[in-house]
Design a protein with these regions (language model features):
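Internal gly/pro-rich beta-alpha loop/helix module
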Residues: 63, 69, 150, 165, ...
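A phosphate-binding glycine/aspartate-rich beta-alpha loop in the early core of alpha/beta enzymes
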Residues: 77, 258-321
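Conserved phosphate-binding/catalytic loops in two-lobed NTP-binding clefts
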Residues: 504, 522-534, 756-761, 768, ...
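A contiguous, well-structured pocket-lining segment that forms one wall/lid of small-molecule binding clefts
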Residues: 185-187, 451-481, 485-489, 604-756, ...
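Glycine-rich phosphate-binding/hydrolytic loop that grips phosphoryl groups
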Residues: 531-553, 557-559, 598-607, 735-736, ...
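Short glycine-rich phosphate-binding loop at a beta-alpha junction
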Residues: 252, 495-507, 753-764
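Conserved phosphate-binding catalytic cores of ATP/NTP-utilizing and phosphoryl-transfer enzymes
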Residues: 296-301, 350, 371-378, 402-403, ...
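Intrinsically disordered, low-complexity, mixed-charge
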Residues: 1-182, 186-189
Length: 815
């Protein structure tokens, strides 16, 4: 019996070959009707025999394109219209809301990579080859629906051959919006740098050369043509870039979401030059390898890591260095892991294949500023760093850094992917957030402004949380401007104007100041404590509504009492929290100065615990010199000396005390090197649990029941130092003490309140030793452990947690 269905498919269904997929399976199942790409999703009218329609719908669910994500299939029986065939219709531009999910950018697929290196293919060595299964998506889109005219490809009318492919439902490039070739598409732009010239004047020079070339079609004698408009010119640009790289130079290379700075990953001098020019310090650099086999020579790649590093997202994956492999000084010194990735754009494939070895690929930006996306601006900003630029004339609409992930042992769950930085390949795919009451408007929008460091923002619409790509640290005007730019882009693209706002408690954060201004203009505001947001994020990702014990260990977060928190054990639900336990407060002499100089933190701990007279403490006092007296005065007088309960600062103090890292050059370095120094050991120092006798505080938000006292840890550490215990053992004992403190405080909370679920969050859980150890120990003690899934444990998840709390409080008020 024949029947007809109207079918709506919601999810990542645009720009991923979904309509040709529907077209092909409809023909296979003898279905007539049509498929339409609309702003709300993909609409299908299907007519056929009942069994054929059932099989058709089943295949939509089971065999959707790999780059797609089907979140929901809605079906409604409708009258037969007796269509005689199945067709693909054009987009419905009259749809009211932009609810379709936009695909992230996708790595070059195997088929396109094969064509890229096939001399018989018309796109041989074309640096922008793509199809419906790969290529740019979110970084080129201006508005929905995802059609070429609404992307940065609108400036490139297709040639006859590309247009034929684009219109053929049987072709892999059917409605591939970025489809192009040498004849009609974007091309490379080659610019060399005169380091003796002013950046702006040098830009005028290269633009004059480009103008001259455009007029007469020839470059200066002995010079590379500035535009790679054909195979010969494009290959010449690749060859020129490779020559500079082999000579130890630095190339700025335009990618999907911005520029990279590239140099030879095996050249110590090149790495030193890059670090000096970029003021990079000792922060580890990521390397891009030409092939998986080449990567395996240097790093251990398990099955889970291989799936990540070869998948469509192509993130940077943190991999264990292979014992005996040679790594150039300056790449990732002192660490057991290397951030590695494979090429994910055609240009990168060409560059890496021609170079024949790994290249450093680090973000093309100045220190603490956003990645550069515009060719002219990048030339000026990166002028003193790069020796040449490989840009292009395809505009980037939204800047994106590379994502960073790792694989950890997650106890009974086995191996799990831990997000470190969520950006290209993952955003803007929404993270589910099931906390909206049914009576609330499913399309109401909450905007969560996020934290100061590792900022993301979040647009919560219904149960879809659009967490932005990694923005960075909102401590300067350029990054704040990038935050505003990305916020406006998301709101316009998804037609989502916030009806309420969530932000951090800290009054001086730029994002919080923006939220306060919006509140003054009438928008409801929900302020969320930093560590509550951390735990709420884990709860929401795991769809937990019942109370949990939340362990939020990190470097800093504004506390309800005005102190700097960071070693918190909380009793949490979605709407509120009680502070159950925390590390005893330590002074931060000089505030930010103590964060940047762990020796100050070590001195403060020894001062607080009356251990400065211990013989092993002398080295800290000597290393600080006159600053020791300054620290003394600040601590004694309470001047410029905030108090902190931060677990991260404790690890910094231990690192400095052991001489592992006294002067870090990047955030987290002291703790990272402490972890790298630790060898597996069952020995542990002690962190004592004592009853909090403080009476000044009066609310559950700032008064804990239990204090975690690190005095025994530091006393035993000094004794071990005096006894010449190996640093590797002392580092392990400090880590094990942290793990034991987590378990013991959770056991005490469980005994008092009966809560058996523990949520772990905060930057300290970027530490593999502590994370894997805590999971194993907690599960061994009978707890269920919840971790972040799609979002990182660090501050990259804060905006999502803020949105979860704001939504839960709104539901509570409405009920």
């Amino acid at each position: 019996m024949k029947e007809a269905l109207d079918i709506e498919v919601h999810g990542i269904v645009q720009g991923v070959g979904f309509r040709p997929f529907i077209y092909k399976i409809a023909r296979r199942h003898l279905i007539n009707g049509w498929v339409l790409n609309a702003t709300a999703g993909v609409f299908i009218h299907a007519e056929g025999e009942s069994k054929d329609i059932d099989d058709f719908v089943m295949e939509i669910s089971d065999n959707a394109p790999a780059a797609s994500r089907v979140d929901e299939i809605l079906m409604k029986e409708v009258p037969l219209e007796d269509f005689e065939s199945f067709t693909i219709r054009y987009s419905d531009e009259a749809a009211a809301e932009a609810t379709t999910l936009v695909s992230p950018d996708l790595a070059t697929c195997d088929e396109c990579a094969a064509e890229l290196f096939d001399p018989a293919n018309r796109r041989y060595h074309y640096p922008f080859i793509n199809c419906t299964n790969c290529g740019p998506r979110f970084t080129i889109i201006n508005k929905l629906p995802y059609d070429r005219k609404y992307t940065s490809m609108a400036a490139f009318p297709m040639c006859e051959q590309c247009a034929t492919e684009y219109a053929d439902p049987e072709d892999r490039r059917f409605h591939a919006q970025p489809d192009a070739c040498f004849e009609c598409g974007p091309h490379l732009i080659w610019r060399t740098v005169d380091h003796s010239a002013n950046a702006q004047e040098d830009l005028e020079r290269v633009k004059a050369e480009e103008s001259s070339f455009a007029e007469n079609g020839t470059a200066k004698e002995g010079c590379i043509a500035p535009f790679g408009v054909d195979l010969k010119a494009s290959d010449a640009i690749i060859d020129a870039a490779v020559r500079i790289l082999r000579e130890g130079g630095i190339i700025a290379v335009k990618g999907l979401g911005g520029f990279h700075l590239a140099c030879d990953a095996r050249n110590r001098e090149a790495l030193a030059t890059l670090r000096a020019r970029k003021h990079r310090g000792t922060k580890p650099l990521a390397a891009m390898y030409p092939t998986l086999d080449a990567l395996r020579e240097d790093c251990l790649v398990g099955n889970a890591e291989e799936r990540l590093i070869t998948g469509a997202q192509r993130p940077i994956v943190l991999l264990k260095k292979r014992v005996g492999a040679h790594f150039a000084e300056g790449l990732a010194d002192g660490l057991s892991e290397l951030g590695a990735m494979l090429p994910y754009t055609p240009l990168q494939h060409l560059l890496l294949a021609a170079f024949g070895g790994p290249l450093v690929m680090t973000s093309g930006n100045l220190h603490d500023e956003p990645i550069q996306t515009d060719d002219d601006k990048a030339f000026v900003v990166l002028h003193d760093i790069a020796d040449a630029f490989v840009g292009n004339n395809r505009p980037i609409r939204c800047r994106f850094d590379d994502s960073v992930v790792r694989v950890i042992k997650a106890g009974s769950a086995g191996e799990a992917v831990q997000m470190v930085r969520r950006a290209r390949g993952y955003a803007p795919m929404p993270v589910p957030l099931k906390c909206k009451a049914e009576k609330n408007d499913a399309q109401s929008v909450i905007f969560a402004a996020g934290p100061e460091q590792k900022n993301t923002f979040c647009l919560l619409r219904g149960e879809k949380a659009f967490v932005s790509q990694h923005i960075g640290d909102l401590e300067n005007a350029p990054t704040y401007d990038a935050w505003l730019e990305a916020k406006s882009h998301y709101e316009a693209l998804f037609e989502a104007q916030p009806e309420s706002i969530a932000c951090d408690l800290h009054p001086e954060y730029l994002a919080s100041k923006w939220a306060a201004t919006a509140h003054e203009n009438g928008t409801p505001l929900c302020k969320v404590q930093h560590h509550h947001a951390h735990i709420a994020a884990v709860m929401a990702e795991n769809d937990l509504d019942e109370a949990v014990i939340g362990v939020a260990f990190d470097g800093t977060g504004y506390g309800a009492d005005g102190a700097i928190w960071g070693g918190e054990v909380m009793l949490c639900n979605r709407t509120d929290y009680e502070r159950f336990a925390n590390f005893s407060y330590l002074p931060l002499p000089g505030g930010a100065a103590a964060i940047k100089n762990p020796l100050r933190m070590a001195y403060a701990a020894l001062w607080q615990y009356d251990l400065l007279d211990h013989p092993a403490a002398a080295r800290v006092v000597e290393s600080l010199g006159e600053a020791a007296d300054v620290c003394d005065r600040m601590i004694e007088r309470g001047i410029n000396c905030p108090m902190t309960s931060s677990a991260g600062r404790l690890l910094d103090a231990v690192s400095a005390l052991l001489g592992i890292c006294e002067q870090p050059t990047y955030e987290g370095e002291a703790a990272i090197l402490l972890e790298a120094a630790a060898e597996p050991s069952s020995e542990s120092y002690e962190i004592a649990l004592v009853k909090n006798t403080a009476t000044e505080q009066s609310t559950a938000h700032d008064t804990s029941v239990v204090l975690l006292d690190a005095e025994p840890l530091f006393r035993a550490l000094l004794d071990d130092m005096q006894a010449d215990v190996p640093v590797t053992i002392m580092a392990a004992k400090a880590h094990n003490a942290m793990i034991a403190a987590i378990v013991q405080s959770c056991l005490v909370a469980n005994a008092a309140y009966g809560i058996s679920i523990v949520a772990l969050a905060g930057g300290v859980f970027m530490n593999r030793f502590i994370t894997e150890g805590a999971i194993a120990a907690l599960e061994g003690a009978g707890f269920t452990v919840a971790l972040g899934k799609e979002l990182p444990p660090n501050d990259g998840a804060i905006s999502y947690g803020q949105a979860a709390v704001a939504a839960a409080r709104a539901n509570q008020q409405a009920s």
